[in-house]
């Protein structure tokens, strides 16, 4: 066993969102209130996950304003929280504080119970919404982990443990990639392109989401239209459209249109379309409090909506992003992962995250409920998503942001 060992930490998320539709009804709010009583543990960590999500987003947005952004804060936070079980000292503190937790305000046991409850809820069978997540621990067959760490990651994070031959990097890479590909139903293939030779432990998290809109768009109405990436760049995209009742309003604080669309089941997508030239203002101004207020106070109007079909992905080396959030020790020779194993010093050599977003017309019925012949209210808005916009996808039962992103160019893979 070498004296210096690196731990490869891999994080990923896959999302397939199929077809926009109108938003939640009173029944959904009633169900959500029942869930509030059933799942207080996950609700306690939800505000912190939301703050982490926005902080993470802003780091990525500062790095580039010309590329799409898409990631799963729940996936990244889950992997880091699980990793924190084996850390000590400053390494431990940095991870939890980087996730927006303050141990003087919330006991660490409550944090891990929150994640345990979150994972249990997300993996609950749902006939209307496909939502699954998983944690895999790939352990070198010659490495002895501490019993407590192994017990905690299995009981709190429902992690599966796999014996892995890391001396054969090609075999180990294939084993990890196969686990990810299976968990994401083939949406993410070959996440891990290469594996460091001194890796002895890999932690993998995935989340898979496939939702259908309550009221889908009619595919026959989709037409090619212009999407203005910036003042100098215009691309042609398939633009869906529907006349209907939408949870849609203009927010003067954000200088943006706010559109909320529910999935069958228990998730909602919030789309934020800034006024022309106001993307920077939106990114600087949006807060978790504002987003929460949108979810609680919905305004329904009859509108003509134009929305692009989207297929984008985001792949990130988390080391740079997390370092900007103060999580640095775990990636250095000063890392204290003595709660994982006592055999040799560990540090995280690689932290990868990939998320995939697909949005199209599809719904449970081909065109059910899409024609508004009996709705007599006056058409109030015509809103066209033909320029960059933000998206946040919330899971209602846990009150958590599953995915966050920015669509700059729908044709950019």
Curated annotation (Swiss-Prot):
Positions where Pyrrolidone carboxylic acid occurs in the chain: 25
Region (RCL): 368-387
Annotated positions for site Reactive bond: 377-378
Glycosylated residues, chain numbering: 65, 102, 165, 266
Keywords, comma-separated and alphabetical: Glycoprotein, Protease inhibitor, Pyrrolidone carboxylic acid, Serine protease inhibitor, Signal
Gene3D superfamilies listed in its UniProt record: Alpha-1-antitrypsin, domain 1, Antithrombin, subunit I, domain 2, Serpins superfamily
GO cellular component labels: extracellular space
Expression tissues: Expressed in liver.
Signal peptide: 1-24
Protein family according to the UniProt entry: Belongs to the serpin family.
Domain notes: The reactive center loop (RCL) extends out from the body of the protein and directs binding to the target protease. The protease cleaves the serpin at the reactive site within the RCL, establishing a covalent linkage between the serpin reactive site and the active site of the protease. The resulting inactive serpin-protease complex is highly stable.
Protein name, as recorded: Alpha-1-antitrypsin-like protein CM55-ST
Lineage: Eukaryota, Metazoa, Chordata, Craniata, Vertebrata
């Amino acid at each position: 066993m070498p004296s210096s060992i690196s731990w490869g930490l891999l994080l990923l998320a896959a999302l397939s969102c199929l077809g926009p539709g109108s938003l939640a009804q009173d029944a959904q709010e009633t169900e959500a209130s029942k869930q509030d009583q059933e799942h207080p543990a996950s609700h306690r960590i939800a505000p912190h996950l939301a703050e982490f999500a926005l902080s993470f987003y802003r780091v990525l947005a500062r790095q580039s304003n010309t590329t799409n952004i898409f990631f799963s804060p729940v996936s990244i936070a889950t992997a880091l929280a699980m990793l924190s079980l084996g850390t000590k000292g400053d390494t431990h503190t940095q991870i939890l504080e980087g996730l927006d937790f303050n141990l003087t305000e919330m006991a660490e046991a409550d944090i891990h119970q929150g994640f345990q409850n979150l994972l249990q809820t997300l993996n609950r069978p749902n006939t209307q919404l496909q939502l699954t997540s998983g944690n895999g621990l790939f352990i070198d067959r010659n490495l002895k982990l501490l019993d407590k760490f192994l017990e905690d990651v299995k009981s709190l994070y429902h992690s599966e443990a796999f014996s892995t031959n890391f001396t054969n990097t090609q075999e180990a890479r294939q084993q990890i990639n196969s686990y990810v590909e299976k968990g994401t139903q083939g949406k993410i293939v070959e996440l891990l392109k290469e594996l460091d030779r001194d890796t002895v432990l890999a932690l993998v998290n995935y989340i898979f989401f496939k939702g259908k809109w309550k009221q889908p768009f009619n595919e026959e109405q989709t037409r090619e239209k212009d999407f203005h990436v910036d003042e100098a760049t215009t691309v042609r995209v398939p633009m869906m459209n529907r006349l209907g009742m939408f949870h849609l309003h203009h927010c003067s604080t954000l200088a943006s249109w706010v559109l909320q669309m529910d999935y069958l089941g228990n998730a909602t997508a919030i789309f934020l379309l800034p006024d022309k030239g106001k993307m920077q203002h939106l990114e600087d101004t949006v807060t978790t409090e504002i987003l929460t207020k949108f979810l609680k106070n919905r305004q329904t109007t009859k509108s003509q909506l134009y929305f692009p079909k989207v297929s984008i992905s985001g792949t990130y080396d988390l080391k740079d992003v997390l370092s900007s959030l103060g999580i640095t020790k775990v990636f250095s020779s000063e890392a204290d992962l003595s709660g994982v194993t006592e055999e040799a010093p560990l540090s995280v050599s690689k932290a990868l995250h990939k998320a995939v977003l697909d949005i199209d017309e599809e719904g449970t019925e081909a065109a059910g409920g899409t024609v508004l012949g009996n709705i007599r209210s006056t058409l109030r808005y015509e809103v066209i998503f033909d320029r960059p916009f933000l998206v946040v996808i919330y899971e209602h039962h846990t009150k958590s942001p599953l995915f966050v992103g920015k669509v700059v160019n729908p044709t950019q893979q």
